[in-house]
C-alpha cells in the first residue's frame, strides 16, 4: 500500500504510515496480553515494526525531494536513537540511518553525483554516530558504494584519502584500501592481473599465455539458471559485433563436475575460476553481468556491463 502512495503529499504519506504502524502495534499489544516476553524481546519487536516504515519514509523524502522543514523533527516524532547498539545488526535500522544521512547531506549539498557530496556524507556520519559498531558499518557501506560506482580513479582517490583520515577501523580500512588498489590495477591500459583458471580437463592455466587474439571474458554460476541462460544468449548476440575476439566463458563455482554438467555452449572457451574469492577481489566481480575486453597483449581495453553493450 505504502509503495503505491509515493504520489501523495508528504503529510498524507506520514498519516498512512502512522495508520499502518498503529495496526501493527495494536496487534503486538494484544499478543503481549497473552504471551509474556522479556523487555529486550519487546524492544526488538517494536523496532522490527518501526524501522521498515522509517526506511520507507526516508525513501519517500529522497524520491520526492521533500523540503527539510517538513521532516527535520522525524527523529523526535518517532523517538529514534541513531546510536542504539542493540540494533547494530538489524538491517532495517542500518538502512534507515544510511538513507537518513543521505537526505541530511543533501540539505547542504545538492550535487549528489559529485565526490564532495560523499565526503560531506562521510563527515556527517562521523558527527552523528557515536557508536563505533554502527559507524563502522555505515563507513563500510559508503566506501564500497563510492568505489563500486562508475566514477574516475582520481575522484575515488580523493574520497579514499579523506576516508582513511577519518576512519579508525583498521580492518575496514584495510578492506577498503585493498578494493581501491585492485581497482587501480584493472583500469583500462593496464595488464590483466594474474588469475588462475581450470579448463575442462582440470588443468590449471593462465589466459595471459594466449597472445594470438583479443579476448572477451564473461562470468556465470550454475546456481543461477536464469542468468546462465540469459548471459549466453546475450553473448551470442555480442559475438556478431566482436567477431575477431575469442570469448571466455568463466564459471565462478567450486565443483568441476557440476560445472561440466552445466556448460551450455561449446562455441566459447569454457574455463572455471580456481579460487573465486581471490578472482572476485582482483577483478572486482560485484556483478555477474560484468565483462572484460582484453587486447592481444592481454591489456585491459574496457570493462562494462553486457546490457550496456547489447542496448547500444
List where the protein language model places each region.
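Oxidative protein folding and maturation machinery
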Residues: 1-202
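Short acidic, S/G/P-rich loop/turn micro-motifs used as interaction or catalytic elements
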Residues: 148, 222-226, 254-256, 307
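Short active-site neighborhood of thiol/selenol oxidoreductases, capturing the structured segment around
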Residues: 205-235, 246-250
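Extended hydrophobic-aromatic, low-complexity segments
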Residues: 206-207, 218, 225-230, 257-260, ...
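Active/binding-pocket-proximal capping segment
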Residues: 222-223, 233-234, 241-244, 251-255, ...
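Non-catalytic, surface beta->alpha helical segment in thiol-disulfide oxidoreductase systems
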Residues: 288-312
